[in-house]
């Protein structure tokens, strides 16, 4: 390194290279984090690339920094690629600046070494952050089982037995007892209990729960999951109508941090130590989602006394903990009556009672209708929906293939990310209103985030192209459909192109039936009469019969969430099939299906676009637009 006392000795080629990279690191810190470095000497430094977000633990960084002197404070903000260090004297800070800048450090899980870049900062402010409280109704019992009992339970799991109660789920092992837990709807088939009940090796742990008064109901369903480092659980609430109040989770083999999220957006990370028992009841069971972020390290408290409870955001107390193989035993009691909990807004039993008759737009209002009959539905059916959406449509693939290499493309309403990986030569970013669908995108390593199509958080003119596939037809009024179109065009640069697909009223066009009609196995009529397309009319929306022609433009379309292992259903065996497997869970999605010329006319109302091409593709009206 060159001198920092104002003189300018001749620099070697390596030193010049280091100073250039150090200047770049300063620029990045200022641009993205707002951290201002200073040219004069001080006791405090910012260590770029030396953060928890780079996979550098507190112990690892501290060992390097202490070579240069006594460290007074070391702040490591969660998930950030930098840290702040304050030495007891400016001389020690100068020594660190001179000797550690450019030093390589191997992160806990880094494939390549990390290079540290140090810069002086004026002052490091230590902000005291209190640990959040546990969600109401959440209890953690530490050391619930002994190490010997833990070993016995883990060794008793027969992962190799080939039964219907064992499956491989997204590369992790899972085993069910009592009833098979269905991950597509967080429920069980109550009419199909598994033989054998709960295993004997769990008896002692359950007896202890009863003796300590931790549970009111004896569990009759158990799911065992084995998680390797890097695996997680999407945020969810176990279906209210499926299980009784208490849900128990026993963590064996390793500790883990589980995230609890309130509907208001507040998140509480909770440490579950090895051999601890988690009990969710009341508000924590019915209102808060719980999940585990898929990663190989957790951010935890560094203090040894903080072995259980919530994780604070105090950057002076955080470090990384490398995950190990964790096996969770989740015990539930199957419910056989409707849920009557104190959280009706989140309760499927109480919502079903309110929604026995189809809604009217006048009663709900457009945004409420979309929230109840689009947003919530897609979150509930995300897994099943994604499993049916895997093959890109050829003409959409052709559009993406026609774009220049390196184009920046937004997929607004990307769903499960089916089109995000079609053309590897493009830089594609997806967004969707459904968090569960976005989670699926992230599992597939696509770039995607949650937002509303009416307000996409990107600057105007940022994209070379946009696609909107099967999105705009979910908006309940013409004004909102036009607003969604305007937002799409706002994202485009001048000369940028957009491809838009919406469902067509004309499922048979020029004597050719769409695939939607061709897949119909019956010729049933609509399930209710068409009630008109004027959304101001306070009449119930008609419920469409799947695989038939449309008789109204504004309607509800059913989605049948099918039980697993369901046999082929025909009119002749329908009654027997439902007796054996249970009926489908039915969700209704709002659609406005477009008539011929409607989409093109809507586009022509915008002054800054030109319709390049308009066509009908498999029951959809489609346009390609260019921004003027």
UniProtKB/Swiss-Prot annotation:
Q: What organism, scientifically named, is this protein from? A: Xenopus tropicalis
Q: Name one GO biological process term.
A: tRNA wobble uridine modification
Q: What is its EC number?
A: 2.1.1.229
Q: What is the lineage of its organism?
A: Eukaryota, Metazoa, Chordata, Craniata, Vertebrata
Which SMART domains does this entry report, sorted A to Z?
RRM
Q: Where is the composition biased (Basic and acidic residues)?
A: 569-582
| Name the UniProt record assigns to this protein | tRNA (carboxymethyluridine(34)-5-O)-methyltransferase alkbh8
Provide GO CC annotations from the record: cytosol; nucleus
Q: Which positions fall inside the RRM domain?
A: 43-123
- Which cofactors are reported in the record for this sequence? Fe(2+)
Q: Which CDD domains match?
A: AdoMet_MTases (cd02440), RRM_ALKBH8 (cd12431)
Q: Where is this region: Methyltransferase domain?
A: 410-628
UniProt keywords (A-Z) are:
Cytoplasm, Iron, Metal-binding, Methyltransferase, Multifunctional enzyme, Nucleus, RNA-binding, S-adenosyl-L-methionine, Transferase, Zinc
Q: Which residues bind Zn(2+)?
A: 240, 339, 341, 347
Per the entry, the cofactor note is: Binds 1 Fe(2+) ion per subunit.
Residues in Fe2OG dioxygenase domain copies: 218-335
Spell out the reaction equation it catalyses.
5-(carboxymethyl)uridine(34) in tRNA + S-adenosyl-L-methionine = 5-(2-methoxy-2-oxoethyl)uridine(34) in tRNA + S-adenosyl-L-homocysteine
Location of the region described as Disordered in the Swiss-Prot/TrEMBL record:
563-582
């Amino acid at each position: 390194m060159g001198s920092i006392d104002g003189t300018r000795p001749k620099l070697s080629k390596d030193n010049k290279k280091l100073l250039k990279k150090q200047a770049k690191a300063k620029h990045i810190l200022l641009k993205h984090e707002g951290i201002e470095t200073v040219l004069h000497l001080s006791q405090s430094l910012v260590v770029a690339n030396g953060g928890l977000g780079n996979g550098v633990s507190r112990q690892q960084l501290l060992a390097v920094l202490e070579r240069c002197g006594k460290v007074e404070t070391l702040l490591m903000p969660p998930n950030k690629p930098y840290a702040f260090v304050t030495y007891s004297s400016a001389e020690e800070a100068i020594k660190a600046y001179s000797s550690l800048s450019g030093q390589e450090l191997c992160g806990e899980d880094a494939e390549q070494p990390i290079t540290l870049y140090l810069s002086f900062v004026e002052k490091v402010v230590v902000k005291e952050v209190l640990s959040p409280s546990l969600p109401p109704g959440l209890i953690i019992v530490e050391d619930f089982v002994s190490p010997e009992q833990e070993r016995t339970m883990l060794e008793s799991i027969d992962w190799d037995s080939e039964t219907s109660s064992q499956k491989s789920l997204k590369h992790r092992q899972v085993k069910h007892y009592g009833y098979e837990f269905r991950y597509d709807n967080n429920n069980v088939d109550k009419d199909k209990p598994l033989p054998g009940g709960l295993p004997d090796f769990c008896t002692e742990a359950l007896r202890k729960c009863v003796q300590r008064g931790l549970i009111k109901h004896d569990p009759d369903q158990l799911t065992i999951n084995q998680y390797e480092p890097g695996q997680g659980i999407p945020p969810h609430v176990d279906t209210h109508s499926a299980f009784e109040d208490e849900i128990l989770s026993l963590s064996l083999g390793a500790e883990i941090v589980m995230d609890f999220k309130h509907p208001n957006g507040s998140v509480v990370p909770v440490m579950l130590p090895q051999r601890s028992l988690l009990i969710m009841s009341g508000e924590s069971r019915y209102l808060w989602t719980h999940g585990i972020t898929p990663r190989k390290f957790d951010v935890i408290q560094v203090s040894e006394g903080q072995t259980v409870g919530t994780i604070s955001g105090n950057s002076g107390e955080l470090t990384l903990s490398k995950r190990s193989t964790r096996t969770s035993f989740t015990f539930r009691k199957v419910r056989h009556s409707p849920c009557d909990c104190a959280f009706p807004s989140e309760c499927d039993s109480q919502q079903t009672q309110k929604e026995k008759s189809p809604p009217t737009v006048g009663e709900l209002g457009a945004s409420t209708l979309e929230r109840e009959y689009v947003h919530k539905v897609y979150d509930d059916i995300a897994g099943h929906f994604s499993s049916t959406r895997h093959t890109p449509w050829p003409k959409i693939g052709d559009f993406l293939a026609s774009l220049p290499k390196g184009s920046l493309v937004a997929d607004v309403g990307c769903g499960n990310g089916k089109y995000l990986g079609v053309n590897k030569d493009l830089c594609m970013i997806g967004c969707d209103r459904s968090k569960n669908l976005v989670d699926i995108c992230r599992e597939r390593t696509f770039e995607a985030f949650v937002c509303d199509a009416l307000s996409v958080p990107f600057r105007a003119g940022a994209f070379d192209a946009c696609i909107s596939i099967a999105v705009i037809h979910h908006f309940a009024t013409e004004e909102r459909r036009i607003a969604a179109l305007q937002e799409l065009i706002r994202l485009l640069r001048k000369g940028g192109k957009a491809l838009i697909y919406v469902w067509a009223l004309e499922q048979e066009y020029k004597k050719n039936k769409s695939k939607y009609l061709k897949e119909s196995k019956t010729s049933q009529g609509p399930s209710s009469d068409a009630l008109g397309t004027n959304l101001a009319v306070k009449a119930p929306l008609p419920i469409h019969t799947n695989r038939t022609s449309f008789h109204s433009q504004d309607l509800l379309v059913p989605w049948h969430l099918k039980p697993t292992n369901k046999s082929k259903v025909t009119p002749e065996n329908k009654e027997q099939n439902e007796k054996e497997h249970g009926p489908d869970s039915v969700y209704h999605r709002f659609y406005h299906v477009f008539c011929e010329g409607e989409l093109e006319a809507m586009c022509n109302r915008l002054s800054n676009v030109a319709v390049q091409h308009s066509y009908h593709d498999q029951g959809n009206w489609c346009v390609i637009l260019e921004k003027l």
